[in-house]
Amino acid sequence: MRFQLCYLLGLLSVTSLSHAASNLICYYDSTSYLRQGLAKMHTHELDLALQFCTHLVYGYAGLKAGTLELFSLNVDLDMFYYKEITALRQKFPQLKILLSVGGDRDVDEAHPNKYVELLEANRTFQQNFIDSSMILVKRNGFDGLDLAFQLPRNKPRKVHGSLGTYWKSFKKLFTGDFVVDPLAEQHKSQFTDLVGNLKNAFRSANLMLSLTVLPNVNSTWYFDVPKLHPQFEYINLAAFDFLTPVRNPEEADFTAPIFFQDEQNRLPHLNVEFQVNYWLQNNCPGQKLNLGIASYGRAWKLSKGSGLSGAPIVQETCGAAPGGIQIQSADGLLSWPEICSKLSQNASAQYRGEMAPLRKVTDLTQKYGNYALRPADDNGDFGVWLSFDDPDFAGIKAAYAKGKGLGGVAIFDLSYDDFRGLCTGQKFPIVRSIKYFMG
């Protein structure tokens, strides 16, 4: 595999006029400290990874409904952790440490559209956000703020039979495409204005500003790329979770392929290449873009109707399989150490049953990703299909980012990597692989 990765790196280097990718943006979800058992992560356990990271993004702050001020989502934790995290700069003086807002952790069922409300707000309320951001960032010693705004998402792909596909095409003649945000153009302009005002305030205080494009947030709706990119030090594309068992419960497919696989009516934008090219083709300098890589996988529950091969797209799935016990996930999410503990290296195995391992299928094309499966038993139980990036495939993506001339890679996040070395004895194998192939 190392030879194949080196070959890919060499191939990409001659097909793109690239500079060495230098950024390794490391996200850290502070709630990992609240987990139990082996998934609980203390700040001192970050040290080994931070020798490789250029930036640490601490998540997450939230947006207070009503006043639209930036605030801590967990005051009891953050009042202690903010200072402890920014104090890491004493050990790693070159490390830039930012506070991130949103990131799909700002759950507010009473106000699900508050980030859009911020865009639509008058100057007084937007100034509340700017002023409170300045105070929270400066008071706690952060170098800047990362905007991971929870904006409306693309509509999930629907599963249709042949008759359903025909009816959908016929109906589209009269109804057009489904519109998620009818005011998207207005919101795009409002986002640009808000960022400009925020940048002006931050510039006077010598603070950084970065953007994180969350999974399935449509860049064409909200981001005026030529006007926006000068306002940000860098832009992180969370190019994963294109499909998940929550968004796509009836079919399983690669969650973060690099390239488009033009088969089985796949949508052409659900891949890394499309997302990266959109920003590059809209005049964003490659050095400002960082490719986001997930250190976790997503698992679907298989039925008897899902078959035995596991080759995606897998049909007749039943939503999310049980997620990681250690990370207490309810939506089919498993961290890398939880994934590796479930894998069998026997490629021809057809294990069944609740405690049986998953059969890993490696992507020899190095284009789409790896997956693993355990077919459902005779009663239709305990079937699992899992899409994930292991350390080797994370290295392939790092090589891709370098070959495209991007600024670097962003890992989401450190607490889902194997920070205890449970898989092979090596700690942070995904971070290490990314760093190695970034050069």
UniProtKB/Swiss-Prot annotation:
What does UniProt say on post-translational modification here? Glycosylated.
Q: Which InterPro entries match?
A: Chitinase_II/V-like_cat, Chitinase_insertion_sf, Glyco_hydro18_cat, Glycoside_hydrolase_SF, Glycosyl_Hydrlase_18, IDGF
Q: Where is the signal peptide?
A: 1-20
Can you cite a GO biological process for this protein?
epithelium regeneration
The residue ranges of the GH18 domain are: 22-439
Which cysteines pair up through disulfides? They are C26-C53, C340-C423
Zinc in keyword set: no
Q: Which UniProt keywords apply?
A: Developmental protein, Disulfide bond, Glycoprotein, Secreted, Signal
Q: Which compartment or compartments is the protein found in?
A: Secreted
- What would be an example GO MF term here? chitin binding
> CDD domains annotated for this entry?
GH18_IDGF
Q: What is its main location?
A: secreted
Annotated Gene Ontology cellular component terms: extracellular region
This chain is glycosylated at: N122, N218, N346
| Family per record | Belongs to the glycosyl hydrolase 18 family. IDGF subfamily.
Purpose of the protein: Cooperates with insulin-like peptides to stimulate the proliferation, polarization and motility of imaginal disk cells. May act by stabilizing the binding of insulin-like peptides to its receptor through a simultaneous interaction with both molecules to form a multiprotein signaling complex.
In its miscellaneous comment, the UniProt entry states: Lacks the typical Glu active site in position 150 that is replaced by a Gln residue, preventing the hydrolase activity. Its precise function remains unclear.
The protein, known as = Chitinase-like protein Idgf1
Q: Tell me the organism.
A: Drosophila yakuba
